[in-house]
Amino acid sequence: TLLPVAAQDVVRGPDRPRHTLSIAVSLLYQRFLAGGTPIAVVSMDNCAQNGKKLRDSCLTLAEGWQRGGFVPEDFLRWLSCEENVSFPWSMIDKITPHPSQKVADQLTALGVAGMTITKSVTGTVSAPFVNAEVTEYLVLEDHFPNGRPPLEQAGVYFTDRATVEKSEK
C-alpha cells in the first residue's frame, strides 16, 4: 500500500515526483536513460532486510509508472538486475530516540525556525530534526556494482548478506 503522496506520484509519472522515494526512483530512471551506469542504492534505515524493502519499494513505484505508460519495461528490467542497481543490506548500531526538547531549544536559540515537536493522533512523535546516539558500528553488504569508496578506513564493516542479517539480531 502506497502513501497518498506516493500514489499521486505514480499517477503523475517520473517527471514531477514529490515523495522522497519517488524522486530517487525518478533519478534512477534518468540514470537509465543516460546509459544505465551501475549504482548501489544504500538504505540506512535501521530495520531488518532494509535493502530488500528499499528495492521492493522502488520496484513498486517503477511498476506503477510502467503500467501508466511513463517508463518502458526495459527500465524495470534494468532496475531489477542487481548488476545494474544493487540495494545492499546494512545494519547500523545506532538508536534514534524521540526528538529532544533540549535539541529543539538549542536549534531555536541558534535562529533555526520551525523546530516544534509534534505528536499525531496515533501518538507518533516527530520533529523537523533528528537527535541520535553516536554510531557504534555500521555493517554493509559488499555489493556495489560500480565500485565503492574505501569506507572500511572509516570503520565500516563490509561483508556478505548473511552476515549482515545475523548482525541485525
PLM regions and their residue ranges:
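Substrate/ligand-engaging "lid" and interaction regions
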Residues: 1-169
